[in-house]
Amino acid sequence: MKKLLVLFASLTMFACSKDLGGEVTPINVPSSTTLTGNITATTTLTSDKEWVLKGYVYVTDGAKLIIQPGTIIKSDISEKGALCIERGAQIVAEGTAAKPIIFTSGRPAGERTPGDWGGIVILGRAKTNRTSEPTIEGGIGRAFGGTNDLDNSGILKYVRIEYAGIAAMPNSEINALTLGGVGSGTTIENVQTIYANDDAFEFFGGTVNAKNLYAYGTADDDYDFDFGYRGKVSNSVSKRDPQFVDNGDAGNGVECDNDGTGSTAEPFTHPILDG
């Protein structure tokens, strides 16, 4: 049985500060709302409160998740969160340079570590080179790909993804941003990953174009292409942190495979890297 979206709204909390005149001034601390299960209708995450992902949260076929500029989404600490946009669903996360949308760990600042939560997974209906319908890795358990290379999964602009990347099992991880069969109608621009515990950006097939991506301090690959990805990634860079490496993986700036076995399945993986 599918779980419904459950919103646990906490009461607004207050802290106090004492000014030089001896007056006690209340300071509003934003309330938090927990997201869990399935999002089945158009839902807006507003910037006036803090949002928490508890476990795997799915935006289902026909639903749309809208996220306002400046919104902060954290993960539950004990039940690590991940956000999956299923085929036929959309995410509209359109931040600005002054008000980016931030996905991050639920731990206090200064205590956050890579792998504190899963990451963002977007699935579409564009072509892959799999002969049977593939299921995205990382324990998400949702199919991706199809025949519509123009498919539109929404907008991701001015978004920062921090401390993501968990392994559901060996060789089956969630990356900071995973794109499976995402079509060229989707907009991916100005997205930064920080301390991803697996790959920063991985493209499993599809035709989505992306620009102005920045991967910082990634454990494994900064950019990973496979399963017949045929889009363009432009004006994108990465920077490594020598103090943070995953000795179990041969992390690369770019990894590009047709598939895990190096087959000649078509369409061939053929990313265009431009600047």
Where on the chain are the PLM-derived regions?
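Beta-strand/loop edge motif enriched in small/polar residues
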Residues: 17-275
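Sec-dependent N-terminal signal peptides
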Residues: 4-13
